[in-house]
Design a protein with these regions (language model features):
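Transmembrane-helix signature of 12-pass secondary carriers
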Residues: 1-179
Length: 179
């Protein structure tokens, strides 16, 4: 979905999925409804493992990409820690504690979704869609003082030389792929 919808729109829908999953799981009254909303949350998690690092690597300056993608991974672990702590604190509130544990997930999900609205679209994605003026504006925003036309040319050259998934199955990659 990130190539079709764009990174930003995909990240927004991931936040919507997270929010609906949290609230739906907390308010579900039967196992099938509960499973449906947990599945919806799983779709959001799965999509975020691809969309978020892709967005970060495409929007970050080259010198900061590794650090920022690493920070994304750290934040996943930190989020798990916060979830354990919040679940511990909520565990003693009675027989509906599980509903609170699931429903409280909606708070960071809503905050995330609202913040996604303020981030710029990926300039690399914009260039692949031939939306050059929008890409130029984003590049000027995130790379002040740099030659934006040169950056656009470099990104376009990288996009042209990009190895697609279909190329992985050619003969020269077959043996390493099997390993």
């Amino acid at each position: 979905p990130t190539n079709r919808l764009g990174r930003k729109k995909t990240l927004f829908w991931i936040g919507v999925f997270y929010t609906i999953s949290a609230l739906g799981s907390a308010f579900s009254n039967d196992p099938i409804t509960f499973a449906f909303f947990r599945f919806l949350g799983g779709l959001g998690v799965g999509a975020s493992t691809i969309a978020a690092p892709a967005y970060i690597s495409e929007i970050a300056p080259a010198k900061d990409r590794g650090k920022l993608v690493g920070l994304y991974q750290f934040n996943i672990v930190f989020g798990i820690l916060v979830a354990f702590l919040s679940n511990y604190l909520l565990s003693g509130i009675g027989e509906n504690a599980w509903r609170w544990m699931l429903g409280v997930e909606a708070i960071p999900a809503i905050i995330y979704t609202l913040f996604v609205l303020s981030v710029p679209q990926s300039p690399r994605w914009l260039l692949t869609k031939l939306r050059n003026d929008e890409a130029r504006n984003v590049l000027q925003l995130i790379n002040p003082g740099q030659d934006v036309e040169k950056l656009m040319l470099e990104i376009n050259q990288e996009n042209e030389n990009k190895v697609t998934g279909e190329n992985i199955f050619i003969k020269k990659y077959r043996f390493p792929l099997i390993l």
